[in-house]
Amino acid sequence: DNYNDEQAEQIAAGTVAAMPHSSAEFVEKASGIKSRYVMNKDGIIDSKRMAPRLPERSNEVQSIQCEMGVAAAQEAMRQAGKTAADIDSVIVAASNMQRPYPAIAVEIQDALGIKGYGFDMNVACSSATFGIQQARDAVRAGSARSVLIVNPEICSGHLNFLDRDSHFIFGDVCTAIIVESAATATSDEQYSIVDSKLQTIFSNNIRNNFGFLNRGDESGTGAADKLFVQEGRKVFKEVCPAVAAQISGQLESLGISPDQLKRLWLHQANLSMNQLISKRVLGRDASADEAPIILDEYANTSSAGSIIAFHKHRADLSSGDLGVLCSFGAGYSIG
């Protein structure tokens, strides 16, 4: 309403389009999202600002992503029965980093007292699954006994809250995973990686042009493309079949039939996407138990979504049960 009031003359003249209203009903119908969690709500709902208020911190204080990453990491370490001395590597895998360097992973490593090495990586919404692959490779190669993967996703920071088609998509959260050899695993709950497969396909349909070279051309400052932008319908049309084909092909190569799967923990971007992908993989509609949804509560939490789904829907698994953990997103990327 504020925008339409300010642009009333241009709207009346037909030179500017009026901004349409959004609603809870529209959001739920379009995405399946009913709620979400964000780092700062007040700044977002302030119609004069519509962006989170996250004050800069001094270099002597933990960064925001480090703080949330440490909290998630400590819980993962507790559940896995691991101390800092047991871990040799930290990978921060997320869709955005709040600074280029020093790496958030190295800051988290220092905060936890972990020796070895750490690095940041970004494959957008597939960052967590790509991180798991990197961790698995490190353990198998012998360069690390145990790897901590942390996914601090502050998605509200790159979201355009003026865009009716995407303002509702993302939420903020942090997850953490520990990958190690079965020989050193001590947790009461242990999950074996049977196989993993990564794929990237270049596309401009999901994009964010914010970067350090923006200062070289002031004409783009504040433009919409410096935040999250996507061609949603194109993404749906192109990503869903690619994801289903990758999962189906991987299962076939392993000699696993779809009816052997106990669960599909899919990236939590859109309810309709997950319903279509799971139907193509299973050959029928998946039950809520087979393909659990958590985006109704958390919204799209980028790389953390499938990890949250796994975390909240794993208690009933028995030894020998099989499942697929899959993420997909900008790039395109599928893991």
Which stretches of residues belong to each language-model region?
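Short beta-strand segments
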Residues: 93, 122, 147-153, 179, ...
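Claisen-condensing/thiolase-fold acyl-transfer catalytic domains that form or cleave C-C bonds
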Residues: 66, 70, 96-97, 110-117, ...
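Solvent-exposed alpha-helices and their adjacent loops that cap or buttress functional pockets
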Residues: 83, 112, 139-142, 167-171, ...
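Condensing-enzyme catalytic core mediating Claisen C-C bond formation in acyl metabolism
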Residues: 1-63, 163-241, 245
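Conserved beta-ketoacyl condensing-enzyme motif
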Residues: 36-123, 253-274
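Acyl-CoA/ACP chain-elongation machinery
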Residues: 151-152, 159, 201-208, 271
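Flexible, glycine-rich active-site loops centered on histidine and acidic residues
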Residues: 143-174
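Short acidic, glycine/serine/threonine-rich loops at helix termini
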Residues: 101-104, 132-133, 158-164, 205-206, ...
